Regions:
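Fold-level recognition of mixed alpha/beta catalytic cores in primary-metabolism enzymes, strongest
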Residues: 31-34, 38, 51, 155, ...
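A diffuse structural propensity rather than consistent per-protein peaks
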Residues: 1-2, 193
Length: 244
């Protein structure tokens, strides 16, 4: 990184670096560049999902007659949880359509870019399966998760199961509707600005926000400034939350 690089970047915006600050900007850019170079040299970290233990069955975009509450499902499939059981044995789960499941296309609530298909599972998916939960599919989210309503997804509108024709909230719109409507026991979402809290409230569900640091591997961010997400689960009944 050269000392004049900062000014060259700013020229296109009609801005300038104060000469007194030039050395500081050079130090900052050089440090960021060196960090990026070091990271780029690291081997890629790509966890391999256990497809023999947890095979994916019948991955598909649901036909209209398979949908619930408008367009609550992004993709349907079936993954059987741990055969040895676990604390979530017998529970059914849906995942917000920003949580990677190997082999399942992600739509992210948009049609601006083509869907992409992950080749690994998000950490939360592995933990659910190991705990015995059965995963039934991915649920519709709002367009790039930028809405707390339930009508911005390119895949279609999600209706509130308790009040058809009204918003289910967002951006975890499909998941909240599936839980409130009794289709699944639990849904997993992500929240930076109300994306779990709003739909849980509008659909009358319990919310169980995480209090610990979670690994966010294979959960897309909307921008580089989002260094964290607030994962959480949504339940129908208080007794279920307490494990009864």
């Amino acid at each position: 990184v050269k000392k004049e690089d900062a000014q060259l970047l700013l020229d296109k915006f009609g801005l300038s670096v104060d000469p007194d600050d030039a050395d500081d900007f050079h130090t900052l850019l050089a440090a960021v560049h060196d960090c990026a170079e070091d990271v780029a040299k690291l081997p890629d970290y790509q966890p391999v999902p256990d497809l023999s233990r947890y095979p994916r069955q019948n991955i598909r975009r649901p036909a209209p007659e398979e949908q619930d509450f408008g367009q609550a499902w992004a993709h349907k499939f079936f993954i059987k949880g741990n055969a040895d059981g676990g604390p979530l044995a017998g529970k059914t789960v849906s995942l917000k359509d920003v949580i990677a499941v190997a082999g399942v296309p992600q739509l992210l609530g948009s049609d601006v870019i083509p869907s992409w298909t992950p080749i690994t599972d998000a950490t939360v998916v592995t933990r659910l399966l190991d705990a015995g939960a059965d995963i039934l599919g991915t649920s519709t989210c709002e367009n790039f998760c930028h809405s707390t309503s339930s009508y911005t997804s390119a895949q279609g509108i999600v209706e509130n199961p308790l009040a058809p024709g009204y918003s289910a909230g967002g951006s975890t719109s499909g998941g909240a509707a599936l839980v409130a409507g009794g289709v699944v026991d639990i849904t997993i979402g992500g929240d930076q600005g109300g994306s779990i809290r709003v739909p849980a409230s509008l659909c009358g569900c319990m919310i169980a926000p995480e209090k610990t640091i979670e690994c966010l591997a294979d959960i897309p961010r909307r921008c580089w400034s989002e260094a964290h997400t607030w994962p959480g689960s949504v339940y129908r009944h208080f007794k279920r939350r307490c494990g009864e």
